[in-house]
Amino acid sequence: MKALNNFINASLLITAFEALSIGKSFGLNSETMLQSMIAATTSRNSPISKKVQPYLADSNYTTGMALSLLAKDVRIVAEMADALDNFAPIAEQCSALWTDAEKRFGGIQDQIDVARLWFENT
């Protein structure tokens, strides 16, 4: 169950960063987008208010959880789904992204550093 909960957290976290990256490329203000995400009932979630918002306010912000730990849990979910022959394209892609971040930035980095996949090129 822990791995499944962390998979939800991991997918919501990278989805928020991807949305912010696309909006930034479109010319939208990061703070305005973030406030809209927090206020909107359909996208209110813990990763946005407890991780993304503090990270955008202070790029030195950390959550205290290593990137490698979240990457491992997401891989467990993707591997479990594959072993059970479940259709799980989101878990597969989410696992690939977290594994890529782990390889690029190092597993000891904070999980919030996954944002660098989007913001180093935006």
Question: What is the role of each PLM region?
Answer:
Residues 1-122:
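Helical "substrate-binding/catalytic lid" subdomain
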